[in-house]
C-alpha cells in the first residue's frame, strides 16, 4: 500500500472540522477515534440568528447525542490529518508525490483509490470533463482567529451569512459566504470588504473581524460536483471530494470521506475480487453521499436568499426538526 500526497509536508495550520457521529464511528473502525476525541472538543449547542442578534432557530446537539450515542466533535484539520498519518505504516506515506497520470499506477497496484479532492486527477482520467464542477452561487471567506468563544453558530442576513465554531483553547474558526455571480472580481482588501458586509452585525461578529490578519483570510468560490453515474471503474475507485464534492453547508464533506474509506475497506475485505468489491462500494455509498450533497446545495441556497425571509426561517426550523445527517 502506498499513500501519495502531493504536498511536501502535512499542514500545521488550518480551520476546524466537525466530526459527526457517523464519521466518528469510521474513525473508531480505523483505530484512531479515541485519539481524535482526546485532541478535539465536544461541540456545544449553537443558534442561527439574524444580523440584529434575534434567534431564528437553535441547534439541539443534545438530541443528536441522545439519538446516536455520540456528540459532534470539533477538531482542527491539521490534527485530524496528523492522527490519520500517524496510524499508517511508516513507509506507506509518500509526501511530495503528486499523481499526474493515474493510468500508470494501475500497472503497479491491484487497486487505485482517487482521494485527491475536488479537482481530482483520477476522476478526470475516468470521466474527462463530462461531469464538471458547478458553481454554487456564492463566494466564501474563512480562517481562524485568536479568540476564545464558548459557543458557535451562524447568522443569516440577506444573501450572506457569517459562522463561528470553537477551534480549541483560545482559537475560533470563522467563515462567511455571500451570494455573488461566478467570476465576480475579488476585492482589493478582504478585511475591509468583510467589515463592510458584516461590521454592523451583532456581537461577537465585529470582534472577530477586528481580530483578522491579512494573511489569515482564505477566499474562494464555492463549487460542488455534478453527480457521477458511478464512483468506480475497473480497479479504480473514487472517494471523498473526488467522488462527491459538496458545498460546506451541512459540514459533511470530511465526514463522508471518512465513511467512504471505511466502507471501501469493508467491501474489499468481504468480496471475492477487487471489481466485485468496488461495485459493492458504489452501491453502498453513491446514493447516500449524493443525497447529502444535494441537501448541502439546498441548504446553501436557503441560507443565501434575499427575499421572503420569514419563509426561509420557517423552512430552516422544519429542516432542523427533521435532524441533520449524522
Where does each model-flagged region fall?
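C-terminal helical "tail/cap" subdomain of flavin- and related membrane-associated enzymes
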Residues: 38, 207, 229, 250-251, ...
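Flavin-dependent oxidoreductases
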Residues: 138-166
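Residue-level marker for buried hydrophobic side chains located in beta-strands
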Residues: 1-4, 112, 232, 236-239
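Glycine-rich FAD pyrophosphate-binding loop
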Residues: 1-15
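FAD/FMN-dependent oxidoreductases across multiple families
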Residues: 158-160, 168-169, 178-250, 256
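Conserved N-terminal helical subregion
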Residues: 20-127, 131-146, 181-195
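Short, glycine/acidic-enriched loop or turn micro-motifs at the edges of active sites
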Residues: 8, 119, 238, 244, ...
